[in-house]
Amino acid sequence: MKYISILGASGSIGTQTLDVIRAHPDEFRLAAASVGKNIEAARRLIAEFSPSLVAVADRDAYKVLYREYRGRTTIVYGEEGLIEAAVCPQADVVVTAVVGSVGLVPTLKAIEAGKAIALANKETLVVAGHLVMAAAKRRGVPLLPVDSEHSAIFQCLQGERMEHVDKLILTASGGSFRDKTRRELAHVTVEEALCHPNWSMGAKITIDSATMMNKGFEVIEAHWLFGLPYERIEVVLHRESIIHSLVQFRDTSVLAQLGTPDMRVPIQYALAYPKRLPLPSAKPLDFISLGALHFAPVDFDRYRCLRLAYEAGKRGGSLPTVLNAANEEAVAAFLAGRIPFLAIEEWIERALERHRPVSNPQLEDIREIDADARAYVRSLLS
């Protein structure tokens, strides 16, 4: 029996993680969860899974739940509450499914507490990959990727030696606007952007997919997880999202992991590792009805956010922190209807250009740089 803590249990990855726990009551049990401000999600979690601890985002939600569950479930709130969920004594595995850089400190605390990390929060490695990987190595803690692309690479590398790897190839659907021209992108709406062709995801990551910043973050994440330089991490467009990623070896052999687009598969793989469990609710791949798979090169002029991510990753230091902070603020402004779609990439580029890089930022540096980049992007609205 593995006890699971989910940071972000009311979001897309979090709810699908609950599906996996629900499907295997003899394998997994929910020890703790965070749910943001979603009081109803907290009530449902407590009723079904009886976790020992539930974290909420603010004091108002805390007051409501504390009155209802005092003496039955520990209710905590704020950043400290999120950390408490991350270091819950009963938890064996912590699923980091919160969105954005808010996941960094709880992840570091969970690593320090010796928890296995099922990593769904890619921003953690984007802003502080050097700190996270060093902490995991120091504590001997496994980082198990939940992103479908990194899970695919991780699976392809089982039993292999990294010195035999030539390159990693991440696949990308192209997002909700893959068939639109740059001219058409100037006028797209929020509603159009939120319609991903293949995956069901939260709002922020769906926009990141449309700009391809999500793929840029995944390139940086792959660099840290697998230790390869950026020159040996490629991205290829693959409309069907059936091949989740590939590994090419030095003898030109290629291994790929395939499957229908269903995030419960990589989630379950991370939770159950090194075992493989059945997943009856997942749809098996039917090659006959599939017919064909399609691939195309990435146009870096078309997807400027992906180019910016590669550049920030290669230069390293504090630039990926600025990349992430500026992206979060710009995407929030787009979702609020305050800026057009193409302004997202423009604002990120401006934030990167004004930043004076720090070569080896520590946690306090990262917090200051993050806050400064956010303040700058917000100032562009006024």
Curated annotation (Swiss-Prot):
Binding site for NADPH: S10, G11, S12, I13, G36, K37, N38, N121, E123, G202
Cofactor(s) of this protein: Mg(2+); Mn(2+)
Record has Manganese as a keyword: yes
Annotated 1-deoxy-D-xylulose 5-phosphate binding sites: K122, S148, E149, S173, H196, S209, N214, K215, E218
Keywords of this entry: Isoprene biosynthesis, Manganese, Metal-binding, NADP, Oxidoreductase
Stored InterPro entries: DXP_reductoisomerase (IPR003821), DXP_reductoisomerase_C (IPR013644), DXP_reductoisomerase_N (IPR013512), DXPR_C (IPR026877), DXPR_C_sf (IPR036169), NAD(P)-bd_dom_sf (IPR036291)
Residues at which Mn(2+) binds: D147, E149, E218
HAMAP family documented for this protein: DXP_reductoisom (MF_00183)
Protein known as: 1-deoxy-D-xylulose 5-phosphate reductoisomerase
Origin species: Geobacillus kaustophilus (strain HTA426)
